[in-house]
Amino acid sequence: MKDKKVIVTGGMGFIGSHLTEKLLENNEVTVIDNEATGKIDNIKHLLENKNLTIVHESIIELDLHEIFKGKDYVFHLAAIPSVPRSVKDPFASNEANVTGTLKVLIAAKDSGVKKVIFSSSSSVYGDTPTLLKREDMPVNPQSPYAITKATGEMYCRVFQELYGLPTICLRYFNVFGPRQDPNSQYAAVIPKFITGIMNDESPVIYGDGEQSRDFTYVKHVVVANILSCESNETGIFNIACSRRITINELVAYINEILGKDIITENIDSRPGDIKHSLADISRAGKFGYNPVGDFRDELKKVIQWFENKRNNAV
């Protein structure tokens, strides 16, 4: 992608900041983010770039029409991205993730945007009995967060069918990488485990640790966003690596890389959590998505990032 004018909602977030960084290499980027879950620190190295514009407000509060006018594409990542947080406060999740998405779609339709790329989630599948998740399977949301993402997908489909707005929905599977926040009470498992084991703290595992995830390095997600935007494809696509890692294996890998032998603490499973998550990613091959990488090598890069961050803070 080159010489385009694009919007990234949630562009200060973990995934959004990586996408913003890549897009800025050849495009004009407007980031909309109120730092509800993102951080300006994630893009501080980009702030001097003359092709970057920042709108430091919530998509819920803004009139998006003026901002979207003259823009080519909208990458919609802004959300409250947490299953347990949605269980605790479903109303806030619905407002940010459903109302926010509807506002984005309306403004995109009215402003002549060429395509909306919507960040969805593998959580929409829930605990469907078939292990390998395919896009044509019925969704079975197990949490308010998953419901908001399934609803966002349906809004995207309806806006394409009724109004002719091209949309594509990317179902991310357990994304990890640098800049992921380990400190929130709703933090994802990989940054939480890395920082805990670095500090000789026992990782807390919900359940027996044999639940598995299709962990996806953030750079693959960035590539998927750009490829899907440039293509003529629309609809729903899984974005993952189609590899199955258990939580117990994850802890073992982190211990091995850090040269530690920290024992886990196992407690009861959480409401809304699912047992297994593994993607069939063949459909995303239609727009050229073909992730290549070794999980342990990617994990080493993330651990190195956290070690550098800790050393620089001293």
Located regions from the model:
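Short beta-loop-alpha junction of Rossmann-like oxidoreductase domains
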Residues: 127-129, 178-180, 283
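Active-site loop immediately N-terminal to the catalytic Tyr-X3-Lys motif
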Residues: 90, 141, 182-183, 232
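A short, amphipathic alpha-helix embedded in the catalytic core of nucleotide-handling enzymes
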Residues: 104, 159, 189, 193-196, ...
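A conserved pocket-lining segment of Rossmann-fold NAD(P)-dependent short-chain dehydrogenase/reductase
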Residues: 86, 136, 166-167, 171-181, ...
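C-terminal substrate-binding subdomain of Rossmann-fold SDR/epimerase-dehydratase oxidoreductases
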Residues: 58, 197-314
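Hydrophobic alpha-helix immediately C-terminal to the catalytic Tyr-X-X-X-Lys motif of short-chain
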Residues: 151, 155, 159, 189, ...
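N-terminal Rossmann-like NAD(P)+-binding domain of SDR-like oxidoreductases, especially those catalyzing
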Residues: 1-175, 301, 309
